[in-house]
Amino acid sequence: MTAVDRVSHYNGGLFFVAGGKSLGFTPLIGGVSRPYIMDMDGRDKRDVSAGGPGFAYGYGASPDGNRVCYHENYQVYISNIDGSEKKHIKTGNPFDFAPKWSPDGVWLLFVSGTHGHWNPYIVKRDGTGLRKLADLNGYQGWILFLDVPDFHDGSSDIPAWSADGGSVFYTAKSGSNVELFQVTLDGAVKQLTRSPPGTLHYHPTPSPDGKQILYGSMRSGIRQLYAMNLSDHTERQLTRLSSGHGAMWPHWRPVSSQP
């Protein structure tokens, strides 16, 4: 079903561009991933990287369908939907990764630093306002799953926008734990979990209505999925897997607003 040997949420798949006239996708061409746009009928395929030489993924269109973002050779770029006015977001760091548009399309969230030592950053869609949003306190930024059969030994644990775009959820080291945090765009941090020693939380995924958040949690050596009510921080366990299994990357099912 895919030519990408490491399937993840940031590799991207086929996605609709706002306006309903085009689709975005990342084909492998000569072993190199490229950000492409095409018409709904599959015609008029265009590489929006402006001939960039790097391996590109983390690809997505802004909510209004006018801009795209992606990282190429671990540097983040923004351009118009047709690939024009390509802009390199220069952080000064060698590892910039996994850009995500805010729900209103004003901001871009991504991680920046070095491999295994990164932090969440934000920048405006015009390339201004770049700043570090929070500190992971040395957390490597990926969850290992060596006890579960898989081609790779880890899965990136990257931050996520809140439903209203006013804050970001992320995981960071706190003592011997990796806990779940929320930070507003002006840098106010709230710790959402306070767990027994050795607990590792990962993959925060807020609900579309902003009332709950899904996440993974490794306690007693087994990775399970949990849901938390953000109003009072109460949580409930969703999976009950046995040793040798692990649950990761939770997703909310879309619900139509139509009756």
Language-model features, listed with the residues they occupy:
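Sequence signature of WD/YWTD-type beta-propeller architectures
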Residues: 1-259
